[in-house]
Amino acid sequence: MNALEQARFNMVEQQIRPWQVLDPAVLHTLQHIARELFVPAAYQALAYTDTEIPLGHGQTMVAPRIDARLMHDVALKPTDKVLEIGTGSAYLTALLADRSHHVVSLEINPELHANARKNLQRAGINNVDLRLEDGSAGAADISALLMPLC
């Protein structure tokens, strides 16, 4: 196990499980989606720490335990279509995509949108429709609505 894999393992064991996120499918997703691919270069060393990470434009990545709890609570099924409002770095988008059929993610900021697209491509995630769009307009044909408020 390399250092990043060990950090990911430690994140799950020391941050996620204590928050009573115990669903094996969610834990598997958190274990195999490389969070470091979604963290700005200046903050790579913090990818698996229990802290918010600045993305610029007043936005942050929430601590991993928050994403984990959201994933646990929405209890996605493989057939679900998800609308996410506020793509940010696309880490949560990647988690959602791993647990659902398709994700539509709306981001209003052009720079965050472009970075999110690159991040998802690097991670090999292709069941996401990223849109540069104001989320207040909404979208149809969605099984679950997740609006990160953190």
Regions found by a protein language model. Name each.
Residues 42-55:
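Short, surface-exposed glycine/acidic/tryptophan-bearing loops
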Residues 13, 47-50, 61-80:
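Conserved alpha-helix/loop element of class I SAM-dependent methyltransferases that forms part
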Residues 5-7, 50, 71, 94-98:
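A short alpha-helix capping/helix-coil boundary motif
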Residues 75-150:
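Conserved nucleotide-cofactor-binding alpha/beta core module
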Residues 1-42:
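N-terminal auxiliary segments of SAM/dcSAM-dependent transferases
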